[in-house]
Amino acid sequence: MKCKRLNEVIELLQPAWQKEPDLNLLQFLQKLAKESGFDGELADLTDDILIYHLKMRDSAKDAVIPGLQKDYEEDFKTALLRARGVIKE
């Protein structure tokens, strides 16, 4: 599991970092942390924050978070009925 997440971080990090070649790795990670709204110590920055921020970085502000689109419902009533099993796929 850790190996898969590491590969995912590297895949997402490489093209983003290449766009900012003047920054070293720590400076770039600090920039990503600040962009994502993380205000703790850099050592506490999780891979989840990096992965989701890198995935969403160049998307529209109102875009749906990856992984949540499949569960998205336009209206609350439909979502509730589907969750209770009244509406089947």
Swiss-Prot record:
Which Gene Ontology terms of cellular component type are present?
cytosol
Q: Which Gene3D superfamilies match?
A: Protein of unknown function DUF1040
Tell me the Pfam families matching this sequence.
DUF1040 (PF06288)
Q: Which family does it belong to?
A: To H.influenzae HI_0845.
The protein's name in its UniProt record: Protein YihD
Per the UniProt record, the source organism is: Escherichia coli (strain K12)
